[in-house]
């Protein structure tokens, strides 16, 4: 985590459907200048301001312009936050540079990816550097992960019922 950051949290992709819902929740729950310092981020300041107004967020809600096709803008954005929630997908097209920027800055990153091959690639590429920088990268923190989580739960319940407990992972 980036302890000297200006914001606790930046919602990247705040003008999209899911990002808008996240920003609306934060606006209702925390307002601006409260216990959680947060900002809305996306490609267009005008669209961010429009969404801010539509969701009823305070006029002084910070807006950060960053573009997935501009790695320098992503690096500048993530340096301002302790954590980034990104709703900008598909992640295999738009998420890799953001993960790299977060790892470099020591900024936590949470995504909604349901793209296992991309997640594996990000882990393989960035795990050691993330450990060194203190960045925590949390993939698949949304609806797309429900089928996987339900599958794991089903396997655990089946193992408990048929084998009397969860089968330990081989070391």
Where are these regions (language model features)?
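N-terminal Rossmann NAD(P)H-binding glycine-rich loop of SDR-like oxidoreductase domains
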Residues: 7-32
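ADP-ribose/adenylate-binding Rossmann-like module
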Residues: 90, 99-119
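The conserved SAM/SAH-binding core of class I Rossmann-like methyltransferase domains
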Residues: 12, 41, 87, 112
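Rossmann-fold NAD(P)-binding glycine/threonine-rich loop
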Residues: 113-135
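Short, conserved SAM-binding/catalytic segment
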Residues: 51-59
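Conserved Rossmann-fold cofactor-binding substructure of NAD(P)-dependent oxidoreductases
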Residues: 64-94
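Conserved glycine-rich Rossmann-like NAD(P)H-binding loop of the short-chain dehydrogenase/reductase
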Residues: 31-47
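Conserved anion/nucleotide-ligand pocket segment
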Residues: 138-144, 148-171
């Amino acid at each position: 985590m980036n302890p000297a950051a200006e914001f606790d949290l930046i919602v990247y992709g705040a003008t999209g459907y899911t990002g808008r819902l996240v920003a609306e929740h934060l606006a209702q729950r925390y307002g601006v200048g409260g216990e959680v310092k947060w900002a809305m981020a996306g490609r267009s300041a005008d669209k961010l301001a429009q969404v801010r107004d539509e969701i009823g967020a305070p006029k002084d809600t910070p807006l950060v312009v960053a573009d997935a096709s501009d790695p320098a803008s992503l690096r500048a954005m993530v340096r301002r936050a302790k954590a980034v929630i990104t709703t900008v997908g598909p992640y295999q097209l738009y998420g890799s540079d953001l993960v790299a920027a977060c790892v470099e800055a020591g900024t936590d990153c949470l995504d909604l990816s349901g793209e296992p091959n991309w997640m594996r690639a990000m882990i393989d590429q960035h795990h050691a550097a993330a450990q060194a920088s203190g960045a925590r990268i949390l993939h698949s923190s949304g609806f797309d992960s429900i089928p996987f989580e339900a599958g794991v739960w089903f396997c655990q319940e089946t193992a408990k019922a048929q084998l009397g407990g969860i089968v330990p992972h081989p070391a």
